[in-house]
């Protein structure tokens, strides 16, 4: 007779969860940040609000964003004028777009990750799908499974309405799934489009306007598994993962799904809430490893906005190059909510390889990945890089 302990031991992987492939994708429609205020105020019939437009122009200029990608084109917005008002009932029309386009964009990212992974998709045992854009039953996890032609017995987990910290959450969940199910290969997909949050400007709700200046569309997919086979190419190991609520931060970042879509609320002190709590998170994550020099690790931080990055850098005394990959993704794509940190992981391993550095983490051994979002919730993931094998010259 087999004991429960023996079954349990046989179910568990031996090594740590490892990222085996990363895929990223954006919609084709690209918007230039420098000309976006003109476009935004024109398309929302708000050009008469000259002072507000000047404020928005300053927000865009300070955003450190060069360009963003958006599924919502001028044509779609002209067909849906309610999207362009500040508070017009429009949820049905927004949902109709989101429930189709979110899984579709996710599928493209997943196909890219599966191609890099190089293994048959039949080996995918779990799917974790994450979005803050649109809700349906069965969900985007089901749609993705159908679009990719995955096994009907794939184990699915659907995460809705988590927001900007969720890129850390999905890695934490994938780590537990991979390490507790021997041979598991977990496909994570974060797919975000601004169709639920786009709206016209309001003089009385400047926090909503901040969102219009920052958010962009994108999807990222990651394959996670423990005990890689010789045919698989490890990129990063997931060493530990934690989630915490920052004290006294209730209401700092809120989103509410209403008839008008997803409304976004942000308090001015979000950057200070994050920067005041980040050192405690770092200490708890790295103290067991004997690491206390925050410049000795590589950094992947959710780029909520430039003020958050500036204050974190200042508070921890980080060298400017520590947040290079993070700032690069913010500049090239804007804030894509949960997908951002996965884009930064992709950027970091590619830049590390191109620069001839020794590891996937900018030549360093240990790293940290942070997600910040509603709650205020902080996700902290400790990463271990993988040596980069020099390619043929």
Swiss-Prot record:
- Superkingdom of origin: Eukaryota
Q: Does the keyword Acyltransferase apply?
A: yes
Which transformation does this protein catalyse, written as a reaction? (E)-4-coumaroyl-CoA + 3 malonyl-CoA + 3 H(+) = 2',4,4',6'-tetrahydroxychalcone + 3 CO2 + 4 CoA
Give the metabolic or biological pathway. Answer: Secondary metabolite biosynthesis; flavonoid biosynthesis
Its Enzyme Commission number(s) read 2.3.1.74
Which InterPro entries does the record cross-reference, listed alphabetically? Chalcone/stilbene_synt_C (IPR012328), Chalcone/stilbene_synt_N (IPR001099), Chalcone/stilbene_synthase_AS (IPR018088), Polyketide_synthase_type-III (IPR011141), Thiolase-like (IPR016039)
Query: Keyword set for this entry?
Result: Acyltransferase, Flavonoid biosynthesis, Transferase
A GO biological-process term: flavonoid biosynthetic process
Question: What is a single Pfam family found in this protein's UniProt entry?
Answer: Chal_sti_synt_C
Q: Which residues form the active site?
A: 164
Gene3D superfamilies this protein is in? 3.40.47.10
Any GO molecular function? naringenin-chalcone synthase activity
Q: Which family does it belong to?
A: Belongs to the thiolase-like superfamily. Chalcone/stilbene synthases family.
What does the record give as the function of this protein? The primary product of this enzyme is 4,2',4',6'-tetrahydroxychalcone (also termed naringenin-chalcone or chalcone) which can under specific conditions spontaneously isomerize into naringenin.
Q: Which PANTHER family match?
A: CHALCONE SYNTHASE 1, HYDROXYMETHYLGLUTARYL-COA SYNTHASE
**Name the record gives this protein:** Chalcone synthase LF2
- Say which species the protein is native to: Ipomoea batatas
Phylogenetic placement of the source organism: Eukaryota, Viridiplantae, Streptophyta, Embryophyta, Tracheophyta
The UniProt gene name for this protein comes to CHS-LF2
């Amino acid at each position: 007779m087999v004991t429960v302990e023996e079954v349990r031991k046989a179910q568990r992987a031996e090594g740590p969860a490892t990222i085996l492939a990363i895929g990223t994708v954006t919609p084709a429609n690209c918007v230039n940040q420098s000309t976006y205020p003109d476009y935004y105020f024109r398309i929302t019939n708000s050009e008469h609000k000259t002072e507000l437009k000047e404020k928005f122009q300053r927000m865009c200029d300070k955003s450190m964003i060069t360009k963003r990608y958006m599924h919502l084109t001028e044509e779609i917005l002209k067909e849906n004028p309610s999207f362009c008002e500040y508070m017009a009932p429009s949820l049905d029309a927004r949902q109709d777009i989101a429930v189709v386009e979110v899984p579709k964009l996710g599928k493209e990212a997943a196909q890219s990750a599966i191609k890099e992974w190089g293994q048959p998709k039949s080996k995918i045992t779990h799917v974790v799908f994450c979005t803050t854009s649109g809700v349906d039953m069965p969900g985007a996890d089901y749609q993705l499974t159908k679009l990719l032609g995955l096994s009907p017995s794939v184990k699915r987990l659907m995460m809705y309405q988590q927001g900007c910290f969720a890129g850390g959450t999905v890695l934490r969940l994938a780590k537990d799934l991979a390490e507790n199910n021997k041979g598991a290969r977990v496909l994570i997909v974060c797919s975000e489009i601004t169709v639920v949050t786009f709206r016209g400007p309001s003089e009385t709700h400047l926090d909503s306007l901040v969102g219009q200046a920052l958010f962009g569309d994108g999807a990222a997919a990651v394959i996670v598994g423990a005990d890689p086979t010789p045919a698989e190419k490890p990129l990063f190991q997931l060493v530990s993962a934690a989630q915490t609520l920052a004290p006294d931060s209730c209401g700092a970042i809120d989103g509410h799904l209403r008839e008008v879509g997803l409304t976004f609320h942000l308090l001015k002190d979000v950057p200070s809430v994050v920067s005041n709590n980040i050192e405690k998170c770092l200490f708890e994550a790295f103290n067991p490893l004997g690491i206390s020099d925050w410049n000795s690790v590589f950094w992947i931080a959710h780029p909520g906005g430039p003020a958050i990055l500036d204050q974190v850098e200042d508070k921890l005394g980080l060298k400017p190059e520590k947040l290079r990959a993070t700032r690069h993704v913010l500049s090239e794509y804007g804030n894509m909510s949960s997908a951002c940190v996965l884009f930064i992981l992709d950027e970091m391993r590619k830049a590390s390889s191109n620069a001839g550095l020794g590891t996937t983490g900018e030549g360093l051994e240990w790293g940290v990945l942070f997600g910040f979002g509603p709650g205020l919730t902080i996700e902290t993931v400790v990463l271990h890089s993988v040596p980069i094998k020099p390619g043929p010259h």
